[in-house]
């Protein structure tokens, strides 16, 4: 899939989709905007290993769309959290710099058609 079509792919193919990671089915859901309960923090994405759910934000707090690169990177980022959690690498899943770095590298490789 070309990167330029990824945003449409996310909206058409990922919305309310299930994926299998290891032996578990994970649900992926798109949210317009994800703010903390106190409205002080914004999340581009979130994964929940207990409920096997991944959420991706499609809009920023100011209601503008999340740009394509950020959405792609967040998708990879949250999938990596899920992969590590399923593989019983909880400590590594909680390592945000590691997950962020691998997500950025995977996206870069994807853009080079190396994946």
Annotate each PLM feature.
Residues 15-69, 82-86, 90-105:
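Active-site scaffold of zinc-dependent metalloenzymes
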